[in-house]
């Protein structure tokens, strides 16, 4: 599979950011650049087509020139709704999803997930300690199952990934690459570190 052309990269920036006081997390700056832009830039070094899933401030995301896709389900019920919306509105068979608050994803993310997926329709990152199911390579074949799952009122990402027949891929050698920003204090610590 030619990764550059067969996988669509997706920055998931559609969340409500409750732990950040409702601030659009993707627009918070790290070293002078919005968090979501760090993720998009990292994906663009690996893939030729990248889009953004966002439910607020679309005009800011659109100013980048990237296509912005809003959730098709009411009330923006979490990252799975963003994944479904992108699959409903984008062509292609494979999608690499990454949350907007993971600015240090590794440069071999797409290649490693693809190489180690075997025949699974879904694979996600495991950093050696915990799963990161929203950093996932997903095949379009799971779209009907995902729609059914969401229509049943389910929202749990990890439960769905396993239900869809997926497995984790070990990235314990890149553990720090998957730390995400959930509070203003964490963002401040990152500003100091990097």
Swiss-Prot record:
Outcome (variant: residue 78 to L): Nearly no effect on catalytic activity
EC top class named in words: transferase
Co-factor remark: Both divalent cations appear to be equally efficient in an vitro reconstitution assay.
Any single GO BP term: bis(molybdopterin guanine dinucleotide)molybdenum biosynthetic process
Binding site for GTP: 12-14, 25, 53, 71, 101
Keyword entries, A-Z: Cytoplasm, GTP-binding, Magnesium, Manganese, Metal-binding, Molybdenum cofactor biosynthesis, Nucleotide-binding, Transferase
Effects seen without this gene: Cells lacking this gene are chlorate-resistant, fail to synthesize MGD and accumulate elevated quantities of MPT.
Catalytic activity: Mo-molybdopterin + GTP + H(+) = Mo-molybdopterin guanine dinucleotide + diphosphate
Entry's free-text remark on domains: The N-terminal domain determines nucleotide recognition and specific binding, while the C-terminal domain determines the specific binding to the target protein. When the N-terminal domain of MobA is fused to the C-terminal domain of MocA, comparable kinetic constants as wild-type MobA are obtained with GTP, and the activity with CTP is completely lost. Consistent results are obtained when the N-terminal domain of MocA is fused to the C-terminal domain of MobA: the kinetic constants with CTP are comparable with the ones found for wild-type MocA, although no activity with GTP is detected.
UniProt subunit comment: Monomer. An equilibrium exists between a monomeric and oligomeric form of the enzyme, which could be an octamer; whether this oligomeric arrangement is of functional relevance is unclear. Interacts with MoeA and MobB in vivo.
Protein's name according to its UniProt entry: Molybdenum cofactor guanylyltransferase
Organism of this sequence: Escherichia coli (strain K12)
């Amino acid at each position: 599979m030619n990764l550059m052309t067969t996988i669509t990269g997706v920055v998931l920036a559609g969340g409500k950011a409750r732990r950040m006081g409702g601030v659009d997390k993707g627009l918070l700056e790290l070293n002078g650049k919005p968090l979501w832009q760090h993720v998009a830039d990292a994906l663009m070094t690996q893939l030729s087509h990248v889009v953004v899933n966002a439910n607020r401030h679309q005009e800011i995301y659109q100013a980048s020139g990237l296509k912005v896709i809003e959730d098709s389900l009411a009330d923006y019920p979490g990252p799975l709704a963003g994944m479904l919306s992108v699959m409903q509105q984008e062509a292609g068979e494979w999608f690499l999803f990454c949350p907007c608050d993971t600015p240090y994803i590794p440069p071999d993310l797409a290649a490693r997930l693809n190489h180690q997926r075997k025949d699974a329709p879904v694979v996600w990152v495991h950093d050696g300690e915990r799963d990161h199911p929203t950093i996932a390579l997903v095949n379009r074949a799971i779209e009907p199952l995902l729609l059914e799952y969401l229509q049943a009122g389910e929202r749990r990402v990890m439960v769905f990934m396993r239900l869809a027949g997926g497995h984790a891929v070990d990235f314990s050698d890149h553990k720090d690459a998957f730390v995400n920003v959930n509070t203003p204090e964490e963002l401040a610590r990152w500003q100091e570190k990097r």
